[in-house]
Design a protein with these regions (language model features):
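Active-site phosphate-binding/coordination module
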Residues: 2-85
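Conserved acidic, metal-coordinating active-site core of Asp-based
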Residues: 54, 58, 65-168
Length: 168
């Protein structure tokens, strides 16, 4: 899944026989029974900063993910409907992200690398422009599960490679 582990419904996290969770598009793979991180391919702080600077030029709800948890600016999260076009997802997003007053303050206060960055766009032309600019960054891998978002991982990170690595 592209979700962080905390964003996976509890029923699935505790489902009998589901031993592993491939999260954040393959950036983090863990043993659900023990909580042990088996594989990590994290986004460097430098690359994440670049992604945040680019997406921050636009009207976006930016999310950063550390250690399986998503964080978003409180003011933007309060208006998730402006950025997330699927009303069925509004409560999920509000419930699964931790609201913070300043995304940059949190980013700068943490030393570790990130699972991923995500930006939800209010305007699709702005999304297109951001995608083009982000695509020029060779240290980033871009995916989109929705017409209005960009999920940003470290280069080479994706669910397929994560499954192959887990299989080894």
């Amino acid at each position: 899944t592209g979700r962080p582990f905390t964003g996976v419904p509890l029923e699935l996290r505790e489902f009998p026989g589901m031993r592993y969770a491939l999260t954040a598009n393959g950036a983090r793979i863990l043993d659900t029974a023990t909580g042990e991180i088996l594989i990590e391919h994290l986004l460097s702080k430098e690359s994440a900063k670049k992604a945040l600077e680019i997406t921050g030029k636009y009207d976006t709800l930016q999310e950063i993910y550390f250690d399986g948890q998503g964080y978003a600016k409180d003011e933007k999260l309060a208006h998730v409907e402006r950025y997330h076009k699927d009303c069925n997802m509004w409560e999920y997003v509000r419930a699964s992200r931790i609201a913070v007053p300043d995304i940059w303050e949190l980013f700068n206060s943490r030393e570790e690398n990130l699972d991923k960055v995500q930006a939800l766009f209010a305007d699709m032309e702005e999304r297109k422009a951001a995608w083009e600019e982000l695509s020029e960054c060779r240290d980033l891998n871009l995916v989109s599960s929705l017409k209005y978002n960009i999920e940003i991982n470290a280069a080479g990170v994706n669910k397929g490679k994560g499954l192959i690595a887990l299989g080894k």
